[in-house]
Amino acid sequence: MKKDKAFAMIKTKILELMKTEGADWTRSWIQKERPINFLTRKNYRGLNWAWLSFTDFKSNEWGTFKQWNSKGYKIKKGSKASFVVFCEMKKKKADWLKGKELETYNTTGDLPYYFFWRVYNVFNADQIEGYEAPKVDNKHTTELTEEDVANIEAFIADCGPKIETLGDQPYYAPLSDYIAMPDKETFFTDTAYYSTLLHELTHWTGHKSRLNRDQSGSFGSQDYAKEELVAEIGSAFLCQMQGVEKTVRADHAQYLNNWMTMISENDNALSSAFSQAQKAVDYLERISNKNALKEVA
């Protein structure tokens, strides 16, 4: 399958979810256990995380035909492959170089890199003869235990954002670099509170001193909608990782039309939003782990 067709299929599915599920479009797929490669034990990321979660399989384990075959497993007859997309990097050949690239090569002898997308067919563990996948434990719950809350609080504290309890609307203030959250008691559940806080925490990663995303868009603008989509996807990823059920924010319904228009008209909008959301999650994991290790030391 060519990458254009693969991206078109993903875009169609997400637009369909936005139309049918509205502001709740992430819940149906983010509630599932995160997809993982059965052989490498690495989690699928970004768009692939979402795309593989759209399927109806019970197992969250996946692999290519070659990977399954390398372990002696066979695909069940009639099984239809799913796919994943990866951005790969290669060095250009010297005879492909032009202009400044050629000048640089003649001076340094270093070949520049180029990026391209590659599509791989994958099969779920449910489609494999004789393979017994570990039972998937859906850890998401509408009620958080004291231990759950302590773990989430520790993760957020290790990330290090400044959080102010004030007002009745949650937001992130990029100029002053703080997160404003209403009093926790004003939320119906702990789940709603932490789902909201993880959304604002994703915004927090965009500060110029961190990932430096464009957060200058005014309310209702296309740039504002882009940043909100990144935060929505990023918080969905974080909720899945922290075992928090994703809750719907009433104010997100107003972004839906902007998101659907943006995704429909710009072929790169969706992949860019998922990529930036994944980078935000990676950043938070990295600094929280680093600070947690400091505390132990």
Question: Model-predicted segments: where are they?
Answer:
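N-terminal accessory/interface modules of nucleic-acid-binding and processing proteins
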Residues: 1-297
